[in-house]
Amino acid sequence: MQAATVVINRRALRHNLQRLRELAPASKMVAVVKANAYGHGLLETARTLPDADAFGVARLEEALRLRAGGITKPVLLLEGFFDARDLPTISAQHFHTAVHNEEQLAALEEASLDEPVTVWMKLDTGMHRLGVRPEQAEAFYHRLTQCKNVRQPVNIVSHFARADEPKCGATEKQLAIFNTFCEGKPGQRSIAASGGILLWPQSHFDWVRPGIILYGVSPLEDRSIGADFGCQPVMSLTSSLIAVREHKAGEPVGYGGTWVSERDTRLGVVAMGYGDGYPRAAPSGTPVLVNGREVPIVGRVAMDMICVDLGPQAQDKAGDPVILWGEGLPVERIAEMTKVSAYELITRLTSRVAMKYVD
Protein backbone atom coordinates (compact mmCIF):
# COMPACT_ATOMS: atom_id res chain seq x y z
CA MET A 1 0.00 0.00 0.00
CA GLN A 2 1.38 3.38 -1.02
CA ALA A 3 1.54 6.20 1.50
CA ALA A 4 2.09 9.84 0.57
CA THR A 5 4.18 9.96 -2.62
CA VAL A 6 4.99 12.71 -5.09
CA VAL A 7 5.19 11.38 -8.64
CA ILE A 8 7.25 13.58 -10.99
CA ASN A 9 6.63 13.14 -14.71
CA ARG A 10 9.89 13.83 -16.53
CA ARG A 11 8.21 13.65 -19.93
CA ALA A 12 5.84 16.45 -18.93
CA LEU A 13 8.76 18.54 -17.69
CA ARG A 14 10.58 18.20 -21.00
CA HIS A 15 7.35 18.95 -22.86
CA ASN A 16 6.87 22.16 -20.89
CA LEU A 17 10.36 23.42 -21.67
CA GLN A 18 9.73 22.83 -25.35
CA ARG A 19 6.33 24.54 -25.13
CA LEU A 20 7.92 27.59 -23.51
CA ARG A 21 10.47 27.71 -26.31
CA GLU A 22 7.55 27.89 -28.72
CA LEU A 23 6.12 30.82 -26.76
CA ALA A 24 9.46 32.66 -26.61
CA PRO A 25 11.33 31.35 -29.66
CA ALA A 26 13.97 34.08 -29.81
CA SER A 27 14.93 33.86 -26.13
CA LYS A 28 17.24 31.61 -24.16
CA MET A 29 15.81 29.80 -21.15
CA VAL A 30 16.90 30.10 -17.53
CA ALA A 31 15.07 27.15 -15.98
CA VAL A 32 14.37 28.28 -12.42
CA VAL A 33 15.06 25.45 -9.98
CA LYS A 34 15.15 27.33 -6.68
CA ALA A 35 13.41 25.91 -3.61
CA ASN A 36 14.25 22.33 -4.59
CA ALA A 37 12.88 23.01 -8.08
CA TYR A 38 9.55 24.16 -6.65
CA GLY A 39 9.33 20.90 -4.72
CA HIS A 40 10.16 18.72 -7.73
CA GLY A 41 13.75 17.83 -6.76
CA LEU A 42 16.69 20.07 -7.64
CA LEU A 43 19.12 17.63 -9.22
CA GLU A 44 16.56 15.36 -10.87
CA THR A 45 14.88 18.36 -12.46
CA ALA A 46 18.13 19.80 -13.77
CA ARG A 47 19.21 16.42 -15.11
CA THR A 48 15.86 16.06 -16.87
CA LEU A 49 16.40 19.37 -18.67
CA PRO A 50 19.76 19.10 -20.46
CA ASP A 51 18.41 21.43 -23.16
CA ALA A 52 17.92 24.34 -20.74
CA ASP A 53 20.36 27.14 -21.51
CA ALA A 54 20.97 27.91 -17.82
CA PHE A 55 19.52 27.31 -14.38
CA GLY A 56 18.35 29.88 -11.83
CA VAL A 57 18.63 29.47 -8.06
CA ALA A 58 18.14 31.63 -4.98
CA ARG A 59 21.01 30.40 -2.82
CA LEU A 60 24.68 29.65 -3.41
CA GLU A 61 24.15 26.27 -1.74
CA GLU A 62 21.69 25.34 -4.47
CA ALA A 63 24.19 26.31 -7.16
CA LEU A 64 26.90 24.22 -5.52
CA ARG A 65 24.58 21.21 -5.35
CA LEU A 66 24.03 21.51 -9.09
CA ARG A 67 27.76 21.57 -9.78
CA ALA A 68 28.40 18.66 -7.39
CA GLY A 69 25.65 16.76 -9.21
CA GLY A 70 27.38 17.16 -12.56
CA ILE A 71 25.44 20.13 -13.95
CA THR A 72 27.84 22.19 -16.08
CA LYS A 73 25.42 24.71 -17.60
CA PRO A 74 25.52 28.33 -16.40
CA VAL A 75 23.85 28.86 -13.02
CA LEU A 76 22.44 32.28 -12.14
CA LEU A 77 22.21 33.42 -8.52
CA LEU A 78 18.93 35.31 -8.81
CA GLU A 79 19.38 37.19 -5.53
CA GLY A 80 23.12 37.59 -5.88
CA PHE A 81 25.62 36.74 -3.17
CA PHE A 82 25.04 37.43 0.52
CA ASP A 83 28.68 37.43 1.69
CA ALA A 84 31.76 38.87 -0.02
CA ARG A 85 33.66 35.73 1.00
CA ASP A 86 31.55 33.78 -1.50
CA LEU A 87 32.98 35.63 -4.49
CA PRO A 88 36.01 33.34 -5.00
CA THR A 89 33.66 30.34 -5.15
CA ILE A 90 31.34 32.12 -7.56
CA SER A 91 34.30 32.94 -9.77
CA ALA A 92 35.84 29.47 -9.63
CA GLN A 93 32.53 27.74 -10.38
CA HIS A 94 31.67 30.19 -13.19
CA PHE A 95 28.34 31.08 -11.61
CA HIS A 96 26.47 34.14 -12.86
CA THR A 97 25.31 36.52 -10.15
CA ALA A 98 22.79 39.30 -9.82
CA VAL A 99 24.18 42.50 -8.33
CA HIS A 100 21.54 44.75 -6.82
CA ASN A 101 23.04 46.90 -4.07
CA GLU A 102 26.02 49.01 -3.07
CA GLU A 103 27.42 46.38 -0.71
CA GLN A 104 27.66 43.79 -3.48
CA LEU A 105 29.21 46.28 -5.87
CA ALA A 106 31.81 47.37 -3.32
CA ALA A 107 32.65 43.74 -2.59
CA LEU A 108 33.26 43.12 -6.29
CA GLU A 109 35.46 46.20 -6.54
CA GLU A 110 37.57 45.13 -3.58
CA ALA A 111 37.84 41.38 -4.25
CA SER A 112 40.91 39.58 -5.51
CA LEU A 113 39.65 36.98 -7.98
CA ASP A 114 41.42 34.67 -10.40
CA GLU A 115 38.71 35.16 -13.02
CA PRO A 116 36.07 37.86 -13.53
CA VAL A 117 32.44 37.09 -12.73
CA THR A 118 29.48 37.26 -15.11
CA VAL A 119 27.16 39.87 -13.61
CA TRP A 120 23.49 40.68 -14.08
CA MET A 121 22.83 44.17 -12.77
CA LYS A 122 19.37 44.17 -11.24
CA LEU A 123 17.34 47.27 -12.05
CA ASP A 124 14.38 48.16 -9.82
CA THR A 125 11.71 49.00 -12.39
CA GLY A 126 8.78 48.84 -10.00
CA MET A 127 8.89 45.73 -7.81
CA HIS A 128 10.64 47.81 -5.10
CA ARG A 129 12.17 44.75 -3.48
CA LEU A 130 15.67 44.26 -4.89
CA GLY A 131 17.47 46.33 -7.47
CA VAL A 132 19.11 49.65 -8.21
CA ARG A 133 16.75 52.59 -8.43
CA PRO A 134 16.57 54.17 -11.91
CA GLU A 135 17.99 57.50 -10.76
CA GLN A 136 21.10 55.73 -9.42
CA ALA A 137 21.40 53.13 -12.16
CA GLU A 138 23.70 54.88 -14.64
CA ALA A 139 26.39 55.53 -12.05
CA PHE A 140 26.06 51.99 -10.70
CA TYR A 141 26.29 50.54 -14.19
CA HIS A 142 29.36 52.64 -14.98
CA ARG A 143 31.18 51.31 -11.92
CA LEU A 144 30.40 47.75 -13.01
CA THR A 145 31.82 48.44 -16.46
CA GLN A 146 35.05 49.67 -14.85
CA CYS A 147 35.40 46.82 -12.35
CA LYS A 148 38.22 44.39 -13.12
CA ASN A 149 36.30 41.54 -11.46
CA VAL A 150 33.26 41.88 -13.74
CA ARG A 151 33.22 40.07 -17.06
CA GLN A 152 32.09 42.47 -19.76
CA PRO A 153 29.58 43.33 -20.98
CA VAL A 154 27.34 43.80 -17.97
CA ASN A 155 23.95 42.10 -18.33
CA ILE A 156 20.73 43.72 -17.08
CA VAL A 157 17.84 42.02 -15.30
CA SER A 158 14.60 43.11 -13.67
CA HIS A 159 11.39 41.50 -12.42
CA PHE A 160 7.71 42.24 -12.96
CA ALA A 161 5.53 42.93 -9.94
CA ARG A 162 2.11 42.47 -11.58
CA ALA A 163 2.64 40.55 -14.81
CA ASP A 164 -0.46 38.50 -14.00
CA GLU A 165 -2.64 41.64 -14.10
CA PRO A 166 -2.60 42.66 -17.77
CA LYS A 167 -5.01 45.58 -17.36
CA CYS A 168 -3.43 47.34 -14.38
CA GLY A 169 -0.84 49.33 -16.35
CA ALA A 170 2.09 48.50 -14.05
CA THR A 171 3.87 46.18 -16.46
CA GLU A 172 3.90 48.72 -19.27
CA LYS A 173 5.53 51.22 -16.90
CA GLN A 174 8.16 48.71 -15.85
CA LEU A 175 8.91 47.85 -19.47
CA ALA A 176 9.32 51.51 -20.35
CA ILE A 177 11.83 52.04 -17.53
CA PHE A 178 13.71 48.87 -18.49
CA ASN A 179 13.86 49.73 -22.18
CA THR A 180 15.03 53.27 -21.51
CA PHE A 181 17.87 52.09 -19.31
CA CYS A 182 18.95 49.25 -21.61
CA GLU A 183 19.04 51.40 -24.74
CA GLY A 184 22.52 51.44 -26.23
CA LYS A 185 23.97 49.06 -23.66
CA PRO A 186 25.59 45.90 -25.05
CA GLY A 187 24.74 43.30 -22.40
CA GLN A 188 22.08 40.61 -22.38
CA ARG A 189 18.61 41.54 -21.06
CA SER A 190 16.01 39.65 -19.03
CA ILE A 191 12.79 40.75 -17.36
CA ALA A 192 10.18 38.05 -18.12
CA ALA A 193 9.48 35.22 -15.69
CA SER A 194 6.45 32.92 -16.00
CA GLY A 195 3.79 35.62 -16.26
CA GLY A 196 5.86 37.65 -18.68
CA ILE A 197 6.40 34.66 -20.93
CA LEU A 198 2.67 33.95 -21.11
CA LEU A 199 1.21 37.45 -21.38
CA TRP A 200 3.92 39.89 -22.45
CA PRO A 201 5.76 38.76 -25.60
CA GLN A 202 7.33 42.20 -25.95
CA SER A 203 9.22 41.47 -22.71
CA HIS A 204 10.98 38.29 -23.80
CA PHE A 205 14.28 39.91 -24.83
CA ASP A 206 17.46 37.77 -24.73
CA TRP A 207 16.60 35.51 -21.78
CA VAL A 208 13.38 34.44 -20.06
CA ARG A 209 13.19 32.83 -16.63
CA PRO A 210 10.35 30.29 -16.41
CA GLY A 211 9.55 29.26 -12.86
CA ILE A 212 6.21 27.76 -11.87
CA ILE A 213 4.94 27.45 -15.46
CA LEU A 214 7.88 25.14 -16.20
CA TYR A 215 6.23 22.69 -13.81
CA GLY A 216 2.87 22.97 -15.56
CA VAL A 217 1.23 25.32 -13.06
CA SER A 218 -0.27 28.66 -14.06
CA PRO A 219 1.22 31.76 -12.39
CA LEU A 220 -2.01 33.66 -12.97
CA GLU A 221 -4.76 34.17 -10.41
CA ASP A 222 -7.62 34.11 -12.92
CA ARG A 223 -8.68 30.47 -12.55
CA SER A 224 -6.43 29.47 -15.44
CA ILE A 225 -4.44 26.24 -15.30
CA GLY A 226 -1.19 25.29 -16.95
CA ALA A 227 -3.00 23.29 -19.62
CA ASP A 228 -4.60 26.51 -20.87
CA PHE A 229 -1.14 27.45 -22.15
CA GLY A 230 -0.23 24.04 -23.52
CA CYS A 231 1.72 22.91 -20.45
CA GLN A 232 1.31 19.65 -18.55
CA PRO A 233 1.32 19.07 -14.77
CA VAL A 234 4.64 17.60 -13.70
CA MET A 235 3.81 16.80 -10.07
CA SER A 236 1.09 14.45 -8.85
CA LEU A 237 0.60 14.15 -5.09
CA THR A 238 -0.67 10.64 -4.47
CA SER A 239 -1.56 8.27 -1.66
CA SER A 240 -3.91 5.38 -0.89
CA LEU A 241 -7.06 4.57 0.99
CA ILE A 242 -6.13 2.94 4.29
CA ALA A 243 -9.73 2.20 5.32
CA VAL A 244 -13.27 2.22 3.95
CA ARG A 245 -16.02 2.56 6.56
CA GLU A 246 -19.81 2.44 6.66
CA HIS A 247 -21.06 5.80 7.95
CA LYS A 248 -24.55 6.57 9.23
CA ALA A 249 -26.61 9.68 8.52
CA GLY A 250 -26.33 12.20 11.33
CA GLU A 251 -22.88 11.07 12.47
CA PRO A 252 -20.06 13.65 12.56
CA VAL A 253 -16.57 13.06 11.19
CA GLY A 254 -13.19 13.97 12.61
CA TYR A 255 -11.91 16.59 15.04
CA GLY A 256 -14.58 19.04 16.12
CA GLY A 257 -17.31 17.13 14.29
CA THR A 258 -17.38 19.87 11.66
CA TRP A 259 -19.05 17.72 9.00
CA VAL A 260 -22.17 15.64 9.56
CA SER A 261 -23.43 13.28 6.90
CA GLU A 262 -26.97 13.82 5.64
CA ARG A 263 -27.22 10.22 4.39
CA ASP A 264 -25.85 6.77 4.98
CA THR A 265 -22.63 6.60 3.00
CA ARG A 266 -19.18 5.10 2.82
CA LEU A 267 -16.17 7.03 4.03
CA GLY A 268 -12.63 6.57 2.81
CA VAL A 269 -9.65 7.39 5.00
CA VAL A 270 -6.59 8.58 3.06
CA ALA A 271 -2.99 8.42 4.29
CA MET A 272 -2.37 12.14 3.83
CA GLY A 273 -2.41 15.13 6.15
CA TYR A 274 -0.82 18.40 7.07
CA GLY A 275 2.17 16.42 8.34
CA ASP A 276 2.82 15.68 4.67
CA GLY A 277 2.27 19.30 3.65
CA TYR A 278 -1.34 18.99 2.53
CA PRO A 279 -3.10 22.21 3.57
CA ARG A 280 -4.91 22.00 6.89
CA ALA A 281 -7.11 24.81 5.59
CA ALA A 282 -8.74 22.55 2.97
CA PRO A 283 -12.48 22.79 3.64
CA SER A 284 -15.06 20.05 3.30
CA GLY A 285 -15.81 19.74 -0.39
CA THR A 286 -12.21 20.02 -1.57
CA PRO A 287 -11.89 17.40 -4.34
CA VAL A 288 -9.57 14.42 -4.50
CA LEU A 289 -9.50 11.60 -7.02
CA VAL A 290 -10.18 8.06 -5.83
CA ASN A 291 -9.85 5.46 -8.56
CA GLY A 292 -10.02 8.32 -11.05
CA ARG A 293 -13.28 9.91 -9.88
CA GLU A 294 -13.74 13.07 -7.85
CA VAL A 295 -14.92 12.76 -4.28
CA PRO A 296 -15.03 15.46 -1.58
CA ILE A 297 -12.97 15.79 1.56
CA VAL A 298 -15.22 15.77 4.63
CA GLY A 299 -14.24 17.05 8.06
CA ARG A 300 -10.94 18.57 9.09
CA VAL A 301 -7.59 17.67 7.60
CA ALA A 302 -5.58 15.97 10.36
CA MET A 303 -1.83 15.51 10.65
CA ASP A 304 -1.79 12.08 9.02
CA MET A 305 -5.25 11.47 7.57
CA ILE A 306 -8.12 12.97 5.63
CA CYS A 307 -11.59 11.54 5.19
CA VAL A 308 -13.51 11.54 1.92
CA ASP A 309 -17.15 10.79 1.13
CA LEU A 310 -17.03 7.90 -1.33
CA GLY A 311 -20.81 7.69 -1.72
CA PRO A 312 -23.28 5.02 -0.59
CA GLN A 313 -22.72 2.72 -3.57
CA ALA A 314 -18.93 2.98 -3.62
CA GLN A 315 -16.94 -0.17 -4.29
CA ASP A 316 -13.57 1.32 -3.33
CA LYS A 317 -11.39 -0.61 -0.91
CA ALA A 318 -8.33 -0.12 1.25
CA GLY A 319 -5.22 0.13 -0.90
CA ASP A 320 -6.92 1.89 -3.81
CA PRO A 321 -5.07 4.87 -5.31
CA VAL A 322 -5.77 8.49 -4.45
CA ILE A 323 -4.58 11.64 -6.23
CA LEU A 324 -4.62 14.84 -4.19
CA TRP A 325 -3.53 16.98 -7.12
CA GLY A 326 -1.81 16.49 -10.45
CA GLU A 327 -2.89 14.38 -13.40
CA GLY A 328 -6.64 14.91 -13.74
CA LEU A 329 -6.92 17.34 -10.82
CA PRO A 330 -4.98 20.59 -11.31
CA VAL A 331 -3.24 21.96 -8.24
CA GLU A 332 -4.71 25.34 -9.18
CA ARG A 333 -8.15 24.00 -8.18
CA ILE A 334 -6.85 23.00 -4.78
CA ALA A 335 -5.27 26.43 -4.39
CA GLU A 336 -8.60 28.06 -5.14
CA MET A 337 -10.49 25.86 -2.67
CA THR A 338 -7.97 26.22 0.16
CA LYS A 339 -6.93 29.86 -0.41
CA VAL A 340 -3.32 28.66 -0.37
CA SER A 341 -1.34 29.60 -3.48
CA ALA A 342 -0.20 26.87 -5.84
CA TYR A 343 3.37 28.10 -5.30
CA GLU A 344 3.08 27.28 -1.61
CA LEU A 345 1.28 23.98 -2.09
CA ILE A 346 3.96 22.45 -4.30
CA THR A 347 6.97 23.77 -2.39
CA ARG A 348 5.97 22.95 1.19
CA LEU A 349 5.57 19.17 1.05
CA THR A 350 7.47 17.57 3.91
CA SER A 351 10.37 15.15 4.01
CA ARG A 352 8.21 12.12 4.79
CA VAL A 353 6.58 12.32 1.36
CA ALA A 354 8.37 9.87 -0.93
CA MET A 355 9.58 11.02 -4.37
CA LYS A 356 9.12 8.91 -7.49
CA TYR A 357 10.24 9.85 -11.00
CA VAL A 358 8.59 8.43 -14.11
CA ASP A 359 8.95 8.88 -17.87
UniProtKB/Swiss-Prot annotation:
NCBIfam families referenced in this protein's UniProt entry, alphabetically: alr (TIGR00492)
Cofactor(s) needed for function: pyridoxal 5'-phosphate
Top-rank taxon, per record: Bacteria
Catalytic reaction annotation: L-alanine = D-alanine
Organism: Shigella sonnei
InterPro entries associated with the record: Ala_racemase, Ala_racemase/Decarboxylase_C, Ala_racemase_C, Ala_racemase_N, Ala_racemase_pyridoxalP-BS, PLP-binding_barrel
Subunit structure comment from the entry: Monomer but homodimer in the presence of the substrate.
Name this protein carries in UniProt: Alanine racemase, biosynthetic
GO cellular component, one term: cytosol
Gene Ontology terms, MF aspect: alanine racemase activity; pyridoxal phosphate binding
Residues where N6-(pyridoxal phosphate)lysine is found: 34
Record bears the keyword RNA-binding: no
Binding site for substrate: 129, 303
Entry keywords, A to Z: Cell shape, Cell wall biogenesis/degradation, Isomerase, Peptidoglycan synthesis, Pyridoxal phosphate
Temperature dependence (free text): Optimum temperature is 50 degrees Celsius.
Broad EC category: isomerase
Enzyme Commission designation: 5.1.1.1
Similarity-based family: Belongs to the alanine racemase family.
Biological process according to GO: cell wall organization; D-alanine biosynthetic process; peptidoglycan biosynthetic process; regulation of cell shape
pH behavior: Optimum pH is 8-10.
Known function: Catalyzes the interconversion of L-alanine and D-alanine.
Involved pathway(s): Amino-acid biosynthesis; D-alanine biosynthesis; D-alanine from L-alanine: step 1/1; Cell wall biogenesis; peptidoglycan biosynthesis
Active site: 34, 255
One Pfam family in the UniProt entry: Ala_racemase_N
